[in-house]
């Protein structure tokens, strides 16, 4: 033990010294990368000031939170000038009626307690599929490496309104079995009898029964890009959608059906430039 003590006295400071060197080396590496990034951005700004396109293409994934639902959008862009980018996009989402109210339910089967919920009076899930073209114009933040670049986006798309029948799980008053039903003239009484409703139907029901209604959609937005000189695209977008369909879109019973829909949205955008 006495022989080990001097060895420990020697090794402990050596270990501390090695750890300090590792930390200093890691800090130096981070500083070097920051400096390289700064120099690259300065070079890109200089190229842009000379009129050169610093990137040719971009793509982004947008997660949109609407005032009446949600959507996911994939977007591709081609830079035309420093300030102008041509865009095309494909989006899919779901629209919900503002009068929808979710009703919780509790039931039992085989000795198990099942907690579920449903929307009373809902007859269709309303999905939207859009293929669009547009343009993105830089309106603020040019040459500002520390700030936010602001762009105006506008365009239009052909739209398909997809109506999927909304299924409920109900207790059959005759057989006592659990049935999954959609709203029809034949099932109207069961569908609206809240006392016999167990919960919503299976997510797999109704996809092969969808009705497609054509339409079109207009899009305007402001995009706040937090790294326009970076290869990684990260932005927040706020905008408006106006959609029109060729037929009324039934969603809830005893609620007027509409062809025209208007909403606002906030979007988180992530992507890449090259």
Predicted features and spans:
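Cleavable N-terminal export/targeting peptides
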Residues: 1-52
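Short loop/turn motifs that connect adjacent beta-strands in outer-membrane beta-barrel proteins
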Residues: 47, 51-57, 79-86, 123, ...
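Residues that define the transmembrane beta-barrel architecture of outer-membrane proteins
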Residues: 55-59, 66-70, 84-86, 125-129, ...
